[in-house]
Curated annotation (Swiss-Prot):
Chain intervals with Basic and acidic residues compositional bias: 421-435, 444-469
Gene3D superfamilies in the record: MHCK/EF2 kinase, Phosphorylase Kinase, domain 1, Tetratricopeptide repeat domain
Region of interest: Disordered: 353-476
Superkingdom of source: Eukaryota
Source organism of the structure: Mus musculus (Mouse)
Gene name of the record: Eef2k
Descriptive protein name: Eukaryotic elongation factor 2 kinase
Keyword Nucleotide-binding: yes
Amino acid sequence: MADEDLIFCLEGVDGGRCSRAGHNADSDTDSDDDEGYFICPITDDHMSNQNVSSKVQSYYSNLTKTECGSTGSPASSFHFKEAWKHAIEKAKHMPDPWAEFHLEDIATEHATRHRYNAVTGEWLKDEVLIKMASQPFGRGAMRECFRTKKLSNFLHAQQWKGASNYVAKRYIEPVDRSVYFEDVQLQMEAKLWGEDYNRHKPPKQVDIMQMCIIELKDRPGQPLFHLEHYIEGKYIKYNSNSGFVRDDNIRLTPQAFSHFTFERSGHQLIVVDIQGVGDLYTDPQIHTEKGTDFGDGNLGVRGMALFFYSHACNRICQSMGLTPFDLSPREQDAVNQSTRLLQSAKTILRGTEEKCGSPRIRTLSSSRPPLLLRLSENSGDENMSDVTFDSLPSSPSSATPHSQKLDHLHWPVFGDLDNMGPRDHDRMDNHRDSENSGDSGYPSEKRSDLDDPEPREHGHSNGNRRHESDEDSLGSSGRVCVETWNLLNPSRLHLPRPSAVALEVQRLNALDLGRKIGKSVLGKVHLAMVRYHEGGRFCEKDEEWDRESAIFHLEHAADLGELEAIVGLGLMYSQLPHHILADVSLKETEENKTKGFDYLLKAAEAGDRHSMILVARAFDTGLNLSPDRCQDWSEALHWYNTALETTDCDEGGEYDGIQDEPQYALLAREAEMLLTGGFGLDKNPQRSGDLYTQAAEAAMEAMKGRLANQYYEKAEEAWAQMEE
């Protein structure tokens, strides 16, 4: 059988059968990579071919109706078909940018390919054939890149001139092998968020390159390489994991995408370090709340703070219902300069963008909850975990294999698309567009924050090469019914959250205090902004750091339930020593005294022992008490008792093991108050004597024998008053 008979036969967009006349094997090979084509099985069975043809015609009939609308005119339908045909013909005649390097003459190597499915969390291995250049053509801060060709597993003959162009990347300095696998997991998790962004119908869709690992088992040590397609065009870094944005590279879509991931995930993560060609991105970084996933590039809430310090909400953010992050007036002035630069951006809104958090397009992952559910398991708010989002099938039949898995696990699956309305089909088409990724060939270091990208080698992607995006990474498959998931797992539901403090405060106010303190990631982001200001990160070396902005974010963090911020503001406003913003002092006014005591009282209610003692002393002595309150020994006794009983963690998850006052001193003060009475507290000599005895025992344990004897004497005096 001739080689060209072994190539997949395709059906064109007009439903006609493909003809081999006038087409060589390379042409046929090219066609089956276009995502608008249906791949048919190789068979000589005439009846089977007829069945396949009818399926293809039915599929493309539905596809055309979806794209053009059920009420669209035949003229618009014809225009859609012609556009696809024109794009395919153009792709076929693109030259190979690496032809001059004659990679086909290099020795063939056997490699084990590791592919990651971000939906199921599974790794699969298979064998591939590659040809890799011996010298790198690009070098970044941490990795170097090698030109590579990989033979498609779909081919039955080794046609290396028709093989796809790839880029193999390896770390310059030796790293643990697990780092390679973490990088792939990160990029494929980020790809899911790109697909979710596309389902909200933005003006321009985004896609993140698919990446896998190849293990060259015939080389010494069996080294690992990352493998990506070669990207066509100019490589640009739009933002980094430290929030850096080049003025001449400001675009709307990359910044809006990062902002979207923060709100859509309920503040549990943000995808940053956006770089690539156009809106085809590679080497992103994900910052998570805990900061423990995905290696050293994950800066946690600090990375989120860095992004929002330099982020100016644009018209895409507004059209998708994303809320601006709260900045101080001085910070806002700096961001407004970027806002003026955004006016030159050419992106035009269609007016059909979906609002972030639209329940109609929320989907769930299949067999194993992916990144977002793993993050939710570690989040402080057990009852407010987030819904995860699965990508749609990348082809009409791609849901089938995983559907069997899901049925096995009793997950409700849309095995077919019967329940999909016209708008759902639109999303499937949008997803198909987003999956049409190119080939990456540029070194991109997500861990080198502020370095400008080095000059890159440019070139056209090889149009007549198989993209093989379906085999280089395991895409998403299967969609789970959200309503059923909510019924089975109501505690896992987590709606998207806005970036605005006022709206987050409204959500927290509906919770009791025990679930309010330390449960807002947005509060942690504002607290990180405080630390960056205090550390001088946001100012020039010779400038004073912005104290007003630091206090602004500290107050917002306190409003959002961050215990450290609440305590810090309470001490600061009360003119007491404080560890956060230690160089900042505020005016001593009645208003500030009231604010300070209110913050300390809130911290005491949240379980902070130091604040309990300060509040008790204020009610006891009247010092540092707010002007609108008066001495109240019953309140003081309550807080002294609470401080004595506090031996577990506070609401912020911390335990203060360094006692501000020893236990015997607090017990003795309680006994003294009960012995004399006053300020709303009745005398109780018997209780006073008991407390003096407890104070004496505590003093003995602390090796304070002389003080213990004094307490025993006072206990006898108190009991003597009781007998009188």
